[in-house]
Amino acid sequence: MMNQPLIELKNIVRRYGHGDTETTVLKSINLKIYAGEMVAIVGASGSGKSTLMNLLGVLDQADDGEYLFRGRQISTLSSDELADLRCYHFGFVFQRYHLLPHLTAVENVEIPAIYSAMEKEKRIERAQKLLCRLGLENQLKHKPSQLSGGQQQRVSIARALMNGGEIILADEPTGALDSQSSQEVLSVLKTLNHQGHTVVLITHDMQIASHADRIITMKDGEIIADSGVTQNLMKSSAQEVTPQLSSMHYLATLRRYHAAFLMAMHMMFAHKIRTLLTMLGIIIGIAAVVCVIALGEGAKNKVLAEFSALGNNTIDIYPGKNWGDPDAIKIQTLNQVDLALLRQQPYLKGATPQISVDLPLRFLNRTVNASVYGVSDAFFQLRKHRLLSGRWFNAHDMATHQAVSVIDKKSQQVIFGTESAVGKTVFIGQIPILIVGVVETPPQNIEGQRATIWLPYNTVVSRLYNQSYFQQITVQVKEHIAPDLAEKAIIDLLTIQHGRKDFFTFSSRKFLQSLQRTTQTLTMMISSIAFISLVVGGIGVMNIMLVSVIERTREIGIRVAVGAKEKDILHQFLIESASVSLLGGMLGVLLSLLLGGLFSAFTDSIKMQFTFSSFLIAFVCSSMIGMIFGYFPARNAARLKPVVALSQE
């Protein structure tokens, strides 16, 4: 009594086309194939034998009828289960070999084991053993172009055996070979059958078919003759030749991803120019984004550095309703009483008045226009001026109305050239003024046309400019006090003191916050423009990946035939696009650093400030672009039907 068939077909029908163009290629095929048989399916071109082979190897599906594998209905299996069936049970030997041209013989044979998650060392060892067993021990590292037709077909057979090859489906395996190579391949297939493999041989040549124990003849999509089931079936040894697979799912998944990454790298470096051109848009886009962020950060830091010269947590008090008030010049209520009152407030760290007047300054026979500022000794610390030489004027100088002054570095160069100003006496009007210190030129004074000189404000009032009120009072809020609350308290205090609000305030903290918001907005606007180039680069990646899918359609078909699941193909192309984009991102960052160095070499007004966050944004953007724009080509690749993909040249 016969055992359960390994393969059983019941009333299988396969049609192509629709409506008037519909063609029935297979008509009510009924067939049983038992384990250990060597079956030849023979027929002329167009008889349906290749279509039948595709159905047997689950590369295609029937329109009607039932296909049972070991009694299990194939139509109930999911896409992944069908892939597992191809991976662990079927091995294909194609007429045109279908070897990947960029891989060596060993690497071609390894492919099925990648999808069965065999460990790398084991799959290399097994691939080498299979090739040696087939007489290719001297061609292990050869690529298909370096092999003869017979050698390529033996590599194809070794690949079919990689995961055990319980069933060998050979489609015209000798069609492209000379007579000697044909005999060698047939001998190998017969040997495999004697070892227990089920061999199904597809051919149009009855002489080739005669090597099989059972011959099935097809014509016009129907089986017209069957010599009958072989009585002395070879005991299957598939269990003996099937490699042991990992039982740990996460390790298997990791191996698949690792193999996909290596394949992606291989494809990138196999097409260096195309990869570089693909990455060019990403490189330019990432470099633009990083440079814009760095430039914005540098500009912000420069502005903040300049703004720090105005002091931290300072509040300026001016006469008038607001900036540009034409009546402000008539208001004379900011005076010594206000200054004394403000200095008594517990929430303030210090206060300094300011009187300014433009007067000629003379040294020897040289006269320059100067902005003369009357301030207190607390002014320099409050405004964070940096002393370069000499000293500040102090409380004693203030109390005794000393004619001492401090000038800035630019004024020193204008008046004294290369000489030091400290200890020199200049004349403002007819009053001799001793210079006791030199400070760094404040950023707001660098482009000014006048010399700048600071004197004790009471000296200015008593000796130079008789004025009883101040043009400005600046206070500094203590660190632990909220500036907004301090500003409100000052407004309330002076409004009560004056009997009305005839002044306005300017908070450095508010201005700083407004400045930061403006800088961030500008950076975002410019970055969004730069981001457009990233999108263009992403579209370039998608275009190239779409072309790559079309170019590699046959490769996709081969991978699916040897056991790749849809997700394996999807992941491989996604990894390729993400790798291209990430590498482009890295090169873009390097380019931005190079541009930053060149920028610094040509100008020192603004320095590009590169930050970790900008690099992080670059890598996130490049990887996301690779994933997003690579998804659609990858999905198209994963959805290709294997029988259609294999038919592409």
Curated annotation (Swiss-Prot):
Q: Which GO terms describe its molecular function?
A: ATP binding; ATP hydrolysis activity; transmembrane transporter activity
- The keyword Amino-acid biosynthesis appears for this protein: no
Q: Which CDD domains would you find in this protein's record?
A: ABC_MJ0796_LolCDE_FtsE
Q: Spell out the subcellular localization from the entry.
A: Cell inner membrane
A Pfam family that the UniProt record links to this protein: ABC_tran
Gene3D superfamilies, alphabetically? P-loop containing nucleotide triphosphate hydrolases (3.40.50.300)
* UniProt enzyme class: translocase
Stretches that traverse the bilayer = 276-296, 529-549, 582-602, 612-632
> Which cellular component terms (GO) are annotated to the entry?
plasma membrane
Alphabetical keyword list? Antibiotic resistance, ATP-binding, Cell inner membrane, Cell membrane, Membrane, Nucleotide-binding, Translocase, Transmembrane, Transmembrane helix, Transport
Q: How does it sit in the membrane?
A: Multi-pass membrane protein
- Classify the main location: membrane
Q: Which residues form the ABC transporter domain?
A: 7-245
UniProt-listed GO biological process terms:
response to antibiotic
Q: Which domain of life is it from?
A: Bacteria
Q: Which residues bind ATP?
A: G43, A44, S45, G46, S47, G48, K49, S50
* Its EC number(s): 7.6.2.-
* Record-linked InterPro entries: AAA+_ATPase, ABC3_permease_C, ABC_transporter-like_ATP-bd, ABC_transporter-like_CS, MacB-like_ATP-bd, MacB_PCD, Macrolide_Exporter_MacB, P-loop_NTPase
- Its biological purpose: Part of the tripartite efflux system MacAB-TolC. MacB is a non-canonical ABC transporter that contains transmembrane domains (TMD), which form a pore in the inner membrane, and an ATP-binding domain (NBD), which is responsible for energy generation. Confers resistance against macrolides.
Similarity comment: family membership = Belongs to the ABC transporter superfamily. Macrolide exporter (TC 3.A.1.122) family.
Instruction: Describe its partners and assembly state.
Output: Homodimer. Part of the tripartite efflux system MacAB-TolC, which is composed of an inner membrane transporter, MacB, a periplasmic membrane fusion protein, MacA, and an outer membrane component, TolC. The complex forms a large protein conduit and can translocate molecules across both the inner and outer membranes. Interacts with MacA.
PANTHER family xrefs: MACROLIDE EXPORT ATP-BINDING_PERMEASE PROTEIN MACB, MEMBRANE COMPONENT OF TRANSPORTER-RELATED
What is the protein's given name? Macrolide export ATP-binding/permease protein MacB
Query: Top-down, what is the taxonomic lineage of the species of origin?
Result: Bacteria, Pseudomonadati, Pseudomonadota, Gammaproteobacteria, Pasteurellales
